[in-house]
């Protein structure tokens, strides 16, 4: 029996989001052993329990108040939301924040030799999918009638097997579609992982812990999106150099020993630093350019 005074978080047991969710919790300082095949794991340093479940069970666990928080793909969350609304329910939850992993898209795909000029091509066609409600929502908006073929896996084989004329499935790189003689023709939904919270009153201790976790998650995500930059630059071109490296705050400028025409600059930049940016910095006279990863940060 779970202790209801502890914060309960549901995450995917295995699969696309599992590794990223585990890494996020670890970088937030939650010490927990998720290596063993346990469905429930307990944090060593915080009053937190982790429930490891199937991804399509997570939205329901949050909406039904079984757990306090859930890390889930927006596609799975939206599908469950539409499913419950179709049954006359009024599901409640809060999306606390979008996360920086789990990116994918839900797309329509057809066989390579099939012509496609728009959603109207699918009029009265049979479409295989694991996301019938998201598919219906999209095609209803396009005024397209279709027949749904519900499959919980291996959706890509449906056209070759004669089960469907087209499919609607998650796409990451498109390699699986290509291997099955299919091509992506329409993106109907773009998704990332998100953190959701159950509806209803939350005890003050739990809410304080949630707020602490959100602050840490923000720091982890911001650190991953930022770099620590160190370089030497000509004093007269400093403004041009800074303009290439947007940051949350002004940089730290330090004098260089024995050289009054140049300075050392340190800053946290939110700009992804490509080779082109470094080449532009060099063309402005910058030298000794170092780009370092940031493990954690807090503003």
UniProtKB/Swiss-Prot annotation:
**What's a single GO CC term here?**
cytoplasm
Q: From the Swiss-Prot or TrEMBL record, state where the protein is found.
A: Cytoplasm
A Pfam family cross-referenced in the UniProt record is HisG_C
The broad enzyme category this protein falls into is: transferase
Q: In which pathway does it act?
A: Amino-acid biosynthesis; L-histidine biosynthesis; L-histidine from 5-phospho-alpha-D-ribose 1-diphosphate: step 1/9
Cofactor(s) needed, names only, are: Mg(2+)
**What EC number(s) has UniProt assigned to this enzyme?**
2.4.2.17
* Keyword Kinase in record: no
Subunit text: Equilibrium between an active dimeric form, an inactive hexameric form and higher aggregates. Interconversion between the various forms is largely reversible and is influenced by the natural substrates and inhibitors of the enzyme.
| NCBIfam families membership | hisG, HisG_C-term
**Job of this protein:** Catalyzes the condensation of ATP and 5-phosphoribose 1-diphosphate to form N'-(5'-phosphoribosyl)-ATP (PR-ATP). Has a crucial role in the pathway because the rate of histidine biosynthesis seems to be controlled primarily by regulation of HisG enzymatic activity.
Name of protein: ATP phosphoribosyltransferase
Its ancestry begins with: Bacteria, Pseudomonadati, Pseudomonadota, Gammaproteobacteria, Enterobacterales
Name the gene: hisG
